[in-house]
UniProtKB/Swiss-Prot annotation:
Residue ranges annotated for the Radical SAM core domain, each copy included: 97-333
Family from the record: Belongs to the radical SAM superfamily. RlmN family.
Gene designation: rlmN
Keywords, sorted A to Z: 4Fe-4S, Cytoplasm, Disulfide bond, Iron, Iron-sulfur, Metal-binding, Methyltransferase, rRNA processing, S-adenosyl-L-methionine, Transferase, tRNA processing
Entry annotation: catalytic residues: E91, C338
Catalytic activity: adenosine(2503) in 23S rRNA + 2 reduced [2Fe-2S]-[ferredoxin] + 2 S-adenosyl-L-methionine = 2-methyladenosine(2503) in 23S rRNA + 5'-deoxyadenosine + L-methionine + 2 oxidized [2Fe-2S]-[ferredoxin] + S-adenosyl-L-homocysteine; adenosine(37) in tRNA + 2 reduced [2Fe-2S]-[ferredoxin] + 2 S-adenosyl-L-methionine = 2-methyladenosine(37) in tRNA + 5'-deoxyadenosine + L-methionine + 2 oxidized [2Fe-2S]-[ferredoxin] + S-adenosyl-L-homocysteine
Domain of life: Bacteria
Protein name per UniProt: Dual-specificity RNA methyltransferase RlmN
EC number per UniProt: 2.1.1.192
Species annotation: Neisseria meningitidis serogroup A / serotype 4A (strain DSM 15465 / Z2491)
Pfam families: Radical_SAM (PF04055), RlmN_N (PF21016)
Length: 364
């Protein structure tokens, strides 16, 4: 079986070429061809000796996930469904703005966590994505938009906020991050690459030590009682532990704050008292808040908070001195908004079946 070179960062690629009896600079050449020029064929790599190209064609490949579906929203947001084999597909979303272009990347086929307000969580879980399947989303997005990072940068920011919990696929995510940041890869700034987590505390500490990029925490609640219900991982890593991990992360973080993501659920976590509890909770954590109006999906059981409740919630936080943004919903007409990504998951957890049985019971 041929080796997929997209699975390697520069360090891994250098070792691979050493095993082939080649010099280290060859790894840099091939990495630039793959990621900066979008090459998918070794014969395109004209500064490699023909003998090396022949050897690579015999032993290796550049395997990119295949496109299953492409959609474009009325607001310019683009979504791609990529085939990762055995009936599974993952979704990648590009969000254009006047001052940046942000790509939202998936890390798993489905998600092993069961956040109750998230469409991905309802789909169950199949497997972790390989490093090639993660970085292949960035490769594909550039290709789909007709650009190469060497000549034109359309994607300025990457957020690991698509399908899956990135920290639960730690090693492959770190390899992909290494490629994103490498000057021979995509040359992105650590400040412009964000990993989102629901609060896997040990992995937060590991990421701080090996690949400190910007960090977003899917908080969504101001107390353990509510968070236990909507983010079950909280039962393992409660808020006190999570806040301590955030403080530790900031010691090496490229930004001097944590971004707390907070989905606004009507009647669940959107009252003035919740905002005041949040202020108390994050007293020792430099942070900003990103309030996310809930994006509905079929049979979710939740409603979006009213604009008035969101405004009051925001004002309480701002008056306490916090930077607060209310996320503008983008791409909801193509189910590309936050919490709507579902992809195509061959579930191994029986979670899809469980939710179907619950819905049938409710309808009966």
């Amino acid at each position: 079986m041929k080796t997929n070179l997209l699975n390697y960062d520069l360090q891994g690629l250098t070792r691979h070429f050493a095993d082939m009896g080649e010099k280290p600079f060859r790894a840099k050449q091939v990495m630039r061809w793959m990621h900066q020029s979008g090459a998918q064929n070794f014969n395109e790599m004209t500064d490699l000796a023909k003998s090396l190209r022949h050897k690579l064609n015999e032993q290796a490949g550049i395997e990119i996930p295949k496109l299953m579906m492409s959609q474009k929203s009325s607001d310019g947001t683009r979504k791609w469904l990529l085939d990762v084999g055995t009936g599974n597909g993952v979704e990648t979303v590009f969000i254009p703005e006047s001052d940046r272009g942000t790509l939202c990347i998936s890390s798993q086929v489905g998600c092993a966590l069961e956040c109750t307000f998230c469409s991905t969580g309802r789909q169950g879980f199949n497997r972790n994505l390989t490093a090639a399947e993660i970085i292949g989303q960035l490769w594909w997005a550039n290709k789909a938009m007709g650009v190469t990072p060497k000549n034109e940068r359309v994607i300025s920011n990457v957020v690991m906020m698509g399908m899956g919990e990135p920290m639960a696929n730690f090693d492959n995510v770190v390899t992909a991050l290494s490629i994103m940041l490498d000057d021979h890869g995509y040359g992105l700034s650590r400040r412009r690459v964000t990993v989102s987590t629901s609060g896997m505390v040990p992995q937060m500490d590991r990421l701080r030590d090996v690949m400190p990029v910007a960090l977003a925490v899917s908080l969504h609640a101001s107390n353990d009682e509510v968070r236990n219900q909507i983010v079950p991982l909280n039962k393992k890593y409660p808020l006190k532990e999570l806040m301590a991990a955030c403080q530790r992360y900031l010691v090496k973080a490229p930004r001097d704050f944590i971004t707390f993501e907070y989905v606004m659920l009507d009647g669940i976590n959107d009252k003035a008292q919740h905002a005041r509890e949040l202020i108390e909770l994050v007293t020792d954590v430099p942070c900003k808040f990103n309030l996310i109006p809930f994006n509905p999906f079929p049979n979710s059981g939740y409603e979006r908070s009213s604009n008035e409740n969101i405004r009051v919630f925001r004002d309480i936080l701002q008056q306490a001195g916090f930077v607060v943004t209310v996320r503008k919903t983008r791409g909801d007409d193509i189910d590309a908004a936050c919490g709507q990504l579902a992809g195509q998951v061959q579930d191994k957890t029986r979670r899809q079946q469980k939710w179907q049985q619950i819905l049938i019971g409710q309808q009966g």
